[in-house]
Amino acid sequence: MMNHKFVLLILLIFYCFFLSGCNNSKKTPCSRKHSHKELSKDDPHNLVYKGYYKVGSQYKIKGKTYKPNAPKSFTETGYASWYGGGGDKFHGKKTANGDMFNKNLLTAAHKTLPLPCLVKVTNKTNNKSVILMVNDRGPFKPNRIIDVSAKAAEVLAFKKQGLAKVKIEYLHAETEKFLKNIKVNKSSNKTLAKSSKKPSSTKVANNKCSINCHIKLVNLKYKLAVN
């Protein structure tokens, strides 16, 4: 009887230790159900980042001037729209920094933030949040601060409505780590952006994890659902 209680006590201590390890992890959550294969299901062959790092020069659209920059901190509140519906003309086309737009990935377009970068977008109506990779410019319609992919609109639960009031938070530290993980060199690509040469492609740090997989891993780190 005593031996049985002792075994149960040891098992209980081990279980508590395991839970503590999961909660204190600074990496991704300990859940083993999220394999790299599963997280890469939307872009399994997207192991090479097709774009390059770009801040860009001042530009004008519809009479309004925009000044791209690379801030350390940035927040913005306003309305989000989404693009990438059925027959959408943007799906499969190049973005402002040479990447390829895919409506099924966790991406977004912003007028001034560096490309690519990570932002946390929160739907102010339902408090749903998701971390997205900004890889394009826009939106240029009045009263809209960000365009998100069709998939991101689903996660934020405003796809049917078309618009949602959101808060954007630029994640500077996470962006720096993300750029290293997908092998994007900021210093070398600044010059490439000004030239006619196409930047050379290099595989991501983990060749079992696609670009979208790396975005999802950051979401899981912040305990945000992405499926």
From Swiss-Prot:
GO biological process, one term: peptidoglycan metabolic process
Membrane topology listed for this record: Lipid-anchor
Entry keyword annotation includes Lyase: yes
PROSITE patterns linked: PROKAR_LIPOPROTEIN
Localization, UniProt: Cell membrane
Segment forming the signal sequence: 1-21
One of the record's GO molecular function terms: lytic endotransglycosylase activity
Residues linked to a lipid group, S-diacylglycerol cysteine type: C22
One GO term describing the cellular component: plasma membrane
Keywords carried by this UniProt record: Cell membrane, Cell wall biogenesis/degradation, Lipoprotein, Lyase, Membrane, Palmitate, Signal
Family note: Belongs to the RlpA family.
Protein role: Lytic transglycosylase with a strong preference for naked glycan strands that lack stem peptides.
Name by which UniProt lists this protein: Endolytic peptidoglycan transglycosylase RlpA
Annotated source species: Rickettsia bellii (strain RML369-C)
Gene name linked to the record: rlpA
